Amino acid sequence: MPKYGCINVHASLLPKYRGAAPIHYAIMQGEKESGVTIMQMDIGMDTGDMIKKVAVPIGENMTMGELHDELKVKGAELLLEVIEDIEAGKAQPEKQSEEEATYASLLKREMERIDWSKAAADIHNLIRGFNPAPGAFTKLPDGKNLKIWGSRLTDKATTAEPGTVVEATKHSFFVACGNGVLEIIEVQPESKKRMAAQVFINGRGVQVGDVLGKE
């Protein structure tokens, strides 16, 4: 048996987002901060006593990949601190609140598809949360898949059907959502590489009036 027991580095501020995909879910749920928790391991899924935490702010346009990289660094630094505390007898584990616990279950394929009837903020969070993997996608009018890697929130309003391309500029295009309009800045057509929306527009990949997301 290990002298001090076993510890684990978990990429969330426990007890929120226990489970397999805490970074994805933090972005997808529009959280303003995430973090790392060093915890004692027990028989449950991320249910052990918490030893130390560090919080990290989540920017409006931060992606899952960017948050992952930041948490990786913070987690390594925190782990060294905790090991020193344990060896010095200074660690003070704290039990998790079951009432405050949430779970980040395994991602499923159906979660990747964009539902344009949702609010622009929710779709933006999905796109950020699935970048760089697995990627959020929609359907083009020709039935082919289009992954969307980059988006921005806008203050535009429209009465157009959700999924309708309501505007296209030299650099991006704008899609009607259930609430609001989302600016699309980076995409990946089926069987092609990621590209700026500008390149996609210039190639006549999408035009004003097209409706995305239809079967």
Pin down the residues of each PLM region:
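Low-complexity, intrinsically disordered/propeptide-like segments
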Residues: E81, R109-E110, G143, E215
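Short amphipathic alpha-helical segments
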Residues: V54, E110-E112, G180-L182
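An anion-binding loop in the catalytic cleft
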Residues: W116-E215
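Donor/substrate-binding cores of folate-linked one-carbon enzymes
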Residues: M1-A104, K108
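Acyl-group handling in specialized metabolite and lipid biosynthesis
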Residues: S105-K118
